[in-house]
């Protein structure tokens, strides 16, 4: 995932003696930020990046609300932070999520870190939105819906100097709508022992599936047809290679389908106000990197480091200027 670039940015900052007092993250930034704020070193984070598997983070468990319930992601984060609450982290931390029904930003600054990251990373329609608290609480979805680059939120929490890492800043080529089939949009589904791959136009995405749990969960599940039928009985009645027509309620453009499936890198960009709120903006080269593609981890970490290395002079200047302003304010107040 593109979030691996955040690790490279952190590595560069610490290599130059710069350690943030607060970390505010959205989606993948919330995941990496939680692990870092809990006290993990860049070297430890790189080791985690090298060993983590998709199946450590996701498992398909279809329901009317989404395909992935986020429980594995939640447990993984809690394990990495040694099951400590956010308020026990050595670095202040906030995960940004979107309150689903009001479409407003919410920050999680205390409590269970894994649940905060799950909320911040729950891509609508792909992940089942967690309800917090579980009984009588509100539902939350991916923070990128309202704060892809949460710089203004960081400022509202008291940040003096904001170093922002925008892993969505690099524009991707727009899909060629002329290449789409004109009659009956369809998706090619293939399965094997490891999971399911879905091909839409020139895009292919693979999701690991626990086949036994998929069958058990989907049995008798009232999901909208035909997508529900596909997911519910795919292991019983659909061949290993087949084309399935998409229902009318699903997107009809490749870019929209990619977003629905979780490939948010196609079109999402930060709000201009959030870009302007950054004292220093770091934009790693993300060419060819999909949000859920974890096959190019070393390159993405390195791109994050290189992009941050290039901004170190600007970061140090911003820190110096902020200290100068603060001293001037103190002297003015005392005179």
Model-derived regions: residue spans:
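Patatin-like phospholipase
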Residues: 1-23, 34-335
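Gly/Ala-rich beta-loop-alpha elbow adjacent to hydrolase catalytic centers
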Residues: 25, 29
């Amino acid at each position: 995932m593109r979030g691996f670039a955040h690790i490279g940015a952190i590595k560069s900052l610490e290599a130059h003696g710069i350690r943030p007092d607060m970390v505010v993250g959205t989606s993948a930034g919330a995941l990496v930020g939680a692990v870092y704020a809990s006290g993990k070193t860049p070297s430890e984070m790189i080791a985690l990046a090298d060993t983590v598997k998709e199946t450590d983070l996701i498992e398909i468990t279809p329901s009317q609300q989404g395909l992935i319930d986020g429980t594995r992601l939640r447990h993984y984060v809690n394990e990495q932070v040694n099951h400590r609450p956010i308020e026990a982290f050595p670095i202040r931390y906030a995960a940004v999520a979107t309150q689903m029904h009001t479409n407003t930003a919410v920050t999680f600054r205390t409590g269970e870190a894994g649940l905060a990251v799950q909320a911040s990373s729950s891509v609508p329609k792909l992940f089942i939105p967690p309800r917090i608290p579980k009984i009588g609480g509100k539902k939350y979805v991916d923070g990128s819906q309202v704060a892809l680059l949460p710089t203004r939120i960081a400022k509202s929490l008291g940040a003096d100097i904001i170093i922002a890492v925008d892993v969505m800043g690099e524009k991707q080529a727009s899909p060629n709508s002329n290449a789409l089939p004109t009659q009956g949009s369809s998706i090619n589904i293939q399965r094997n022992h490891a999971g399911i791959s879905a091909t839409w136009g020139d895009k292919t995405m693979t999701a690991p599936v626990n086949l036994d749990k998929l069958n058990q969960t989907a049995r008798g599940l009232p999901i909208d047809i035909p997508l529900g039928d596909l997911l519910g009985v795919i292991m019983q009645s659909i061949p290993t290679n087949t084309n399935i027509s998409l229902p009318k309620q699903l997107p009809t453009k490749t870019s929209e389908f990619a977003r629905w499936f979780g490939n948010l890198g196609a079109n999402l960009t930060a709000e201009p106000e959030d870009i302007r709120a950054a004292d220093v903006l770091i934009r790693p080269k993300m060419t060819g990197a999909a949000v859920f593609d974890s096959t190019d981890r070393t390159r993405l970490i390195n791109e994050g480091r290189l992009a941050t290395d290039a901004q170190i002079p600007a970061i140090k200047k911003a820190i110096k200027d902020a200290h100068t302003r603060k001293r001037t304010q103190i002297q003015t107040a005392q005179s």
